[in-house]
Amino acid sequence: MGVCGYLFLPWKCLVVVSLRLLFLVPTGVPVRSGDATFPKAMDNVTVRQGESATLRCTIDDRVTRVAWLNRSTILYAGNDKWSIDPRVIILVNTPTQYSIMIQNVDVYDEGPYTCSVQTDNHPKTSRVHLIVQVPPQIMNISSDITVNEISSVTLLCLAIGRPEPTVTWRHLSVKEGQGFVSEDEYLEISDIKRDQSGEYECSALNDVAAPDVRKVKITVNYPPYISKAKNTGVSVGQKGILSCEASAVPMAEFQWFKEDTRLATGLDGVRIENKGRISTLTFFNVSEKDYGNYTCVATNKLGNTNASITLYGPGAVIDGVNSASRALACLWLSGTFFAHFFIKF
């Protein structure tokens, strides 16, 4: 919009036109001077969004009239303010310097500014370009997500800023130097594995201010895997405990069987306790009939697995006494009936 669009009085428009004619500065066409040292405006001015920008113009006693323009709009002519923007103020108007300030600078203030002077002989101009920098800001980022193992995952992180920020993704839930880094708005993970679960950090950086950082959590579901199951030896009349530990997401539910019979707390003097990843089967007073093989079954919505654990008495010879046999199994669970096929290893 031209300057007359901002003014309410026709005579002011006439004065502006007169100023342009007086300075011989047609709209949008600054006059060039052969004297490169006069007037002398600053080099390009770079400020951050929200700061104040000072535009200085060096002049001398040959100057009879002086003005600051933004493109074709006069901001100040001498001490007279023509801009209706309250953020624009005059700082210095002396025989050697003519300076204005733009407060609380925003991106729309960026562009060319012209110092125009009139001497006894010729009109002269000098131009400065205002550059507005904007700190990085993440505007849109993916929400926390839960997926099944072997799925594909795409995370999005959109950021703005001036200069345009660099967006980097980093996996936080691994040791330093072991996680992968992606310099892109999109992070794509194909056939995601359980060890790729955890927090992912998006960082937007453009060196204007501290990076903007946000995090996304990926939860990877996977079927149970029995990581620890140990055979136990105990004498008749003593307390015996069989323990079974399973890793799974969601957390596994446990069941205990002896042959085809499902065990329950309070039956035959046993107690079953499930705490997190560990399930224990406790015998408070072991008898001869308690000796034998027990099966721990761990189940979640993605599948199940089991391990065979032996409770044995003194002098018994057990293969692999330090670890129970594990098995991949096909299971049918219905009431107390338990059928299975083992592939032992």
Swiss-Prot record:
Intrachain disulfide bonds: 57-115, 157-202, 244-296
GO CC annotation terms, alphabetical: apical dendrite; dendritic spine; neuronal cell body; plasma membrane; postsynaptic density; side of membrane
Protein's membrane topology: Lipid-anchor; GPI-anchor
Signal peptide start-end: 1-27
Proregion residues excised on maturation: 323-345
Lipidated residue numbers (GPI-anchor amidated asparagine): 322
Residue intervals of the Ig-like C2-type domain: 39-126, 136-219, 223-310
BP GO annotations: cell adhesion; negative regulation of glial cell proliferation; positive regulation of cell size; positive regulation of synapse assembly
Domain of life: Eukaryota
Pfam families: I-set, ig, Ig_3
PROSITE patterns the record matches: IG_LIKE
Protein name in the entry: Opioid-binding protein/cell adhesion molecule
Source species: Rattus norvegicus (Rat)
